[in-house]
Amino acid sequence: GAWSAERRLAYWINAYNALVLRAVIEAYPIRGTSAEFPAASVMQIPGMFAGREHQIAGERLTLELIEEERIAPFGDPRAHLALGRGAVGSPRLRSEPFRELELETQLEAVVADFATTPRHVTVDRAADQVVVSALLGWRPDRFAGLAGADDSTGRSALERGVVSLIAPALFPSERAFLAENTFRFSYHEFDWRLN
């Protein structure tokens, strides 16, 4: 029979992650020459995300096409946090595959891990700032969609969406700090070193 939406989404997340791992293994040891990225970085692999095509489900797709045309249409921005990009700045790759019946719980765990990992989210009450992974700014429309209709905070839809995504995983004191709405919002520089 037809696959459920959860099974299809789990399939594409798992495929993406497996293809990243395969590309890294095939290119290892990575010794790039581009000064733009660290020498041992997935970004030193030619065409890593947008150029290299992979045979998957009877199609030839790049990692970028898998993310944009197969994963994004499900409309769940948490899925972008489930993608391992082979970089230190990426969310932690799970030690188990995503599964249809556990997908909701697994995606909630991905967000909780992301929100409580300082290189992804730093809530600094002393400095009155929230610094989040640049990853959240790469797909602003996806995360802004979580913002809801209340724009009385004076914040952008993206900032409100990010706060609504991460707040449930934070400590009560951090949630209270976010509710005060006095913080500066900025992004960590993405760490492209190989993880």
Where in this protein do the model-derived segments appear?
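Interaction/scaffold regions that mediate signaling and macromolecular assembly across diverse proteins
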Residues: 1-195
